[in-house]
Amino acid sequence: MDRSTFEAGLTRDGYEIVSITMKPDAVNPEHVHPFDARVMVVDGAMTVDREDTGARTFQVGEWFELHAGCRHSEAAGDAGATYVAGRRLPAKQ
């Protein structure tokens, strides 16, 4: 999938869009978000280690989703990583 198609889907589905760059080999330790996230790597590579599915490395053009409260960590590859992230607060019940 290309970036413009991914971003169009985020907008359609009510996500706020941000772009984030991680330096080479940077690590964002285990944490949770209060929002749902949909993320696509646009440069480099990043490994996401989720409590529910384990670790997976994502390359350019690959994407994943995290539901609010999903414990995970992120690590950039040796060339760093840039990704587009959509953030959306979960629906109130």
Show where each model-derived region lies.
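Transition segment at domain starts
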Residues: M1, E7-T11
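A generic "binding-loop/recognition-motif" signal
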Residues: P24, P34, G54, C70-R71, ...
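Ligand-binding loop in jelly-roll beta-barrel domains
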Residues: A68-Q93
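Conserved short histidine dyad/triad with adjacent acidic residue
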Residues: R3, E16-H33, A68
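Short histidine-centered beta-strand/loop micro-motifs
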Residues: G9, V27-H33, D49-R50, R56, ...
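Short acidic-glycine-tyrosine-enriched beta hairpin
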Residues: D52-G69
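Glycine- and acidic-residue-biased ligand/ion/polar-headgroup-sensing regions
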Residues: P34-M46, E51
